[in-house]
């Protein structure tokens, strides 16, 4: 570990401060050394995702160099990475850096405090040459997997174990007698071995592959290989697994994206075909018990923390119980301002916990600008969405708390612990807060089990996103729990408006069997509809936020508003969306000028 400037050498890579996009270019590559430069405008910038990525590219006997200014005062320095996860505000992050420095000391990494003028990198040791032959562990899977009766195969391994090479060689072998396809998040992130065989084995982008499946233009009797499958939405993976006769998925445990055991737990739950998991454990890129790998694993809390630390224990619980938990969550948990933690332990073991953040209590002028579509400040996820998309201005003005995560140890789930956590959190934390919180909110990927869980906890459904989230493959649902008298009135208003609009929403036909709501089919315009249309025509409210009100206007007078027919379908098909929207706003503005 170097605390000074250093010049690059041939073959190495240099990452500057929080440049995650630069770091991602090196995924799947190998380098003799890497330099991570933490310096940023007189302070520091440490992006854990970027650090973990470049650490995973270093070959055996290679070195990671860290340029860190003012090591002794690191806890007091501003960290510009905090603006990503602290509502846009740059803060010092003392809790994380105390933890970080303790790990550096534990592993005994070398320090050198040097000036630019008197330093040169030491000579790099000769690198181990990569071998094309399979290890005994790889060879065993190579021979057994094609003969196994399971339809779905998941190959898991930490970085540097050769899972992509193994999968590539399997694909090459199978392609001699079978139809074989490859897919991944994008072609650019495929490891080099996959790219070398792509001319013989066709690659399909995931969305393109789904289109081929829908059009019945691709043979189901094929082997589909999915590289780094945890980076794709679970519903998409399940579609692939249902369609193809044989599917081989690879994914990285101890991943910089946080998709480790959580993926292995969640993925098999909805499979209808026989499934088998194969594991690679022996490192190929470096030696067993490599100190840098162990340091990164401990830094990202990939295993239960060896020493008592509230934040580390809580983060490990999240990583175990959640499909997507990232290093950014780790930084946020350690040092973000204005967050609430509530935990439940038994026999000195953390069993479950809730992570929540305050929202709302915004100035009326800012809330109005959010409603108009003119401001999008960071934070206030549910409050802003209800204000803008739900046409509920008060959502941003009232005081609320959003439950960001709830987690229970995987082996103890479905035993009522989650409901107990919610109840205790509201009774012990929320209802004791002064000034009193008006409501508690939660947002989650909409599925029947989760909807049922939150309803049993007393939450009421008030909003569903019109489109599915790319990261999860689900529509997002938002539910509220009233606390104050003002909150009671607001939640009743939000629920009534949601039920009034539901049958006209573009997603209703898809979700109606899941929703335990009998919608109120009301086509008559009210004042909120007119205000919504004015916000669309005269301000910057979106088509999605105004869609139901525009549909009511069309239904009220279809002869004079033919342009509003099938709005959602028009918008999805149209090429010049921006110009089309501006024309629609102009037409409605003229209409309002003569009718309102």
Curated annotation (Swiss-Prot):
Domain called N-acetyltransferase: residue spans: 328-481
Record GO biological process: rRNA acetylation involved in maturation of SSU-rRNA; tRNA acetylation; tRNA wobble cytosine modification
Gene that encodes it: tmcA
Single GO MF descriptor: ATP binding
Binding site for acetyl-CoA: 406-408, 413-419
UniProt keywords, alphabetically: Acyltransferase, ATP-binding, Cytoplasm, Nucleotide-binding, RNA-binding, Transferase, tRNA processing, tRNA-binding
Main location: cytoplasm
Organism: Actinobacillus pleuropneumoniae serotype 5b (strain L20)
InterPro entries for this protein: Acyl_CoA_acyltransferase, GNAT_dom, NAT10/TcmA_helicase, P-loop_NTPase, TmcA/NAT10/Kre33, TmcA_C_sf, TmcA_tRNA_bind, tRNA_acetyltr_TmcA
Protein family membership: Belongs to the RNA cytidine acetyltransferase family. TmcA subfamily.
Function: Catalyzes the formation of N(4)-acetylcytidine (ac(4)C) at the wobble position of tRNA(Met), by using acetyl-CoA as an acetyl donor and ATP (or GTP).
Superkingdom of the organism of origin: Bacteria
Compartments, record wording: Cytoplasm
Reactions catalysed, as given in the entry: cytidine(34) in elongator tRNA(Met) + acetyl-CoA + ATP + H2O = N(4)-acetylcytidine(34) in elongator tRNA(Met) + ADP + phosphate + CoA + H(+)
Gene3D superfamilies linked to this entry: 3.40.50.11040, 3.40.630.30, P-loop containing nucleotide triphosphate hydrolases (3.40.50.300), tRNA(Met) cytidine acetyltransferase, tail domain (1.20.120.890)
EC number(s) recorded for this UniProt protein: 2.3.1.193
Listed GO CC annotations: cytoplasm
Pfam families membership: GNAT_acetyltr_2 (PF13718), NAT10_TcmA_helicase (PF05127), tRNA_bind_3 (PF17176)
HAMAP family attached to this UniProt entry: tRNA_acetyltr_TmcA (MF_01886)
Binding-site positions, ATP: 138, 160-169, 285
Protein name per its UniProtKB record: tRNA(Met) cytidine acetyltransferase TmcA
